[in-house]
Amino acid sequence: MIPEALRKQALIAYKHGLRATRVAFDGDNRVLLAARAEMRKGMENPDSSKTTQEQIQHLEEVATFLKRNLVQGQKIEGEEKYHLKIHKDIELGDNESIKQPTKFKARPFKKCSDN
C-alpha cells in the first residue's frame, strides 16, 4: 500500500502531466489523446523497477519538458514553410553558449601510415 502523502504527490504529478499535454498538443487531438493514454497506462501499471518517488519525479520531469521544450509545427499549404506554435511557457534560448569557444583543442589528425 502506498502512503497517503505519496498518493497525493502522484495525483498532483499526474495533473501536471495532463495540463502539460493540453499546452503542448493544443489543437492536435490525435496526439493529445495518445499522450494522455500513455500517461494513464503508466499510472495504472507503474514501472516496478523504480520506486514510487522516482516515478513521481519522472512524471514531473516529463510534464516540465512537454510544457517548456516541445513545439509543434504545422505545414503552411502551398509553401515549404511551417508555422510553429510557440506559447508563453516555451524556453527561448539566446544562443550565447554556442558563441563561446570550447576549452578543448582538436587533436592533430593522425594517418595509419604515420606509424
From Swiss-Prot:
Transmembrane segments: none
Gene Ontology CC terms, in alphabetical order: mitochondrial matrix
UniProt xrefs under InterPro entries: Complex1_LYR_LYRM7, MZM1/LYRM7
Subcellular location as annotated: Mitochondrion matrix
Example GO biological process: mitochondrial respiratory chain complex III assembly
Chain residue ranges for the region called Disordered: 96-115
GO molecular function: protein folding chaperone
Basic residues bias: start-end ranges: 102-115
Main location class: mitochondrion
Record key words, sorted: Chaperone, Mitochondrion, Transit peptide
Assembly description: Interacts with RIP1.
Family per similarity comment: Belongs to the complex I LYR family. MZM1 subfamily.
Function of the protein: Assembly factor required for Rieske Fe-S protein RIP1 incorporation into the cytochrome b-c1 (CIII) complex. Functions as a chaperone, binding to this subunit within the mitochondrial matrix and stabilizing it prior to its translocation and insertion into the late CIII dimeric intermediate within the mitochondrial inner membrane. Modulates the mitochondrial matrix zinc pool.
Family annotation (PANTHER family): COMPLEX III ASSEMBLY FACTOR LYRM7
Protein name, per record: Mitochondrial zinc maintenance protein 1, mitochondrial
Natural source organism: Candida glabrata (strain ATCC 2001 / BCRC 20586 / JCM 3761 / NBRC 0622 / NRRL Y-65 / CBS 138)
Organism placement in taxonomy: Eukaryota, Fungi, Dikarya, Ascomycota, Saccharomycotina
